[in-house]
Amino acid sequence: NYGLLLTPALLSIGQDTDDIVTLGVMYAETFIGTYATKEILKAVVDRPRPYTYFEGAPEEDIEDWNNSFPSGHTALSFASAGFISYVFSAYYPESSWRIPVTIAAYSAAAATSVLRILGGNHFMSDVLAGAAIGTLWGVGIPMLHTLGDNVKMGATPFALAFSLSF
């Protein structure tokens, strides 16, 4: 799972300094957005983890026994996979490696999801929600950056607003 967090650095190989900074900022935005969304949902949704239903589950010894929804590992893995596949395809649109890179990134993210379910840490709905959250942030942030001046974002004390023009 954490290997996927480092792989966007590979996208910066052979890029100029401005591109490296842009990639770093985009990836930081992706990571922070995914992490914040995951944390907010975990605070709002009080869902026990699957292992708490097993006999002998040590609830009192585990702090996050009720933080099943959504799967944070899955969200961050899919955010990385979405980011990698989108940015790689944008930087190398003619590359024959676009499909293999996308398959590898999403396979690693899917493997993380499966292991979270098999480990008794999450239900299927937890990982599906995490995958959706991660993919939205992972693809959404670089996509917003490519739209450039057509996207405006502003913050108020009560909300975050987006404006998209064509």
Residue ranges and their predicted role:
Residues D16-I20:
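Membrane-helix interface linkers and caps
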Residues A9-Q15:
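Conserved, well-structured interaction surfaces
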Residues N1-A9:
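Hydrophobic alpha-helical transmembrane segments
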